[in-house]
């Protein structure tokens, strides 16, 4: 086999491997997608709730590579079918918003939605994630707005340096007028790779299936 043919075959196999890299699975009623590139695994689920103007995505990252990588929520974006991009916000921005506008209901929704997703998914074992952050976040702060901000600071994905073998998880907040993300692409530029996950509008898919069953 010539060197050229070898290179072409390698490229084809690489593209095929990437096309099949997305793993779909379900846990406790939530749907997850996962992908591993360069030894770093990214897993996510769309949380079935929103806080204020934000659509929320739970993201978990596990560094199985041989070098350290820094991950942050700003690495995440959502591309709509028309090409419009929705950039995920830094954790500090979300926390400040909830200090200004948050309430008791926001605290309850945040904690309930995130913990239900996290604790019912046996695939997530973070070394630097929510469980380690929450210990100091939920002290008696008095104000419901401060409690909402504390909940967000514990739950939100924050800028984290992951050494080989380390992992983290957190919620990523997308400003989307309080609506679900819907159909599009979830894009994460992390660990020197670009993770692209196609998304479908769950409501639209359900309606399509119902119409398909009509004789």
Model-identified regions with their sequence ranges:
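Positively charged n-region of N-terminal signal peptides that target proteins for export
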Residues: 1-5
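Bacterial N-terminal signal peptides
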Residues: 6-14
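Conserved functional micro-motifs across diverse proteins
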Residues: 20-215
């Amino acid at each position: 086999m010539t060197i050229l043919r070898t290179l072409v075959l390698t490229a084809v196999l690489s593209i095929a491997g990437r096309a099949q890299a997305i793993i779909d699975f379900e846990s406790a009623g939530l749907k997850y997608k996962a992908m591993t590139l360069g030894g770093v695994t990214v897993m996510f689920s769309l949380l079935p709730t929103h806080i204020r103007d934000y659509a929320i995505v739970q993201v978990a990252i596990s560094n199985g590579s041989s070098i350290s990588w820094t991950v942050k929520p700003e690495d995440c974006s959502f591309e709509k079918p028309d090409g419009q991009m929705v950039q995920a916000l830094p954790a500090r921005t979300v926390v400040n918003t909830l200090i200004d506008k948050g309430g008791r209901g926001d605290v309850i929704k945040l904690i309930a939605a995130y913990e239900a997703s996290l604790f019912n998914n046996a695939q997530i074992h973070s070394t630097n994630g929510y469980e380690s952050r929450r210990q100091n976040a939920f002290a008696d702060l008095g104000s419901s707005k401060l409690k909402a901000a504390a909940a967000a600071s514990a739950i939100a994905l924050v800028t984290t340096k992951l050494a080989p073998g380390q992992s983290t998880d957190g919620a990523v907040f997308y400003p989307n007028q309080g609506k679900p993300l819907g159909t599009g692409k979830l894009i994460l530029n992390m660990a020197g790779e670009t993770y692209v996950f196609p998304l479908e509008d769950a409501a639209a898919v359900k309606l399509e299936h119902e119409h398909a069953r009509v004789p």
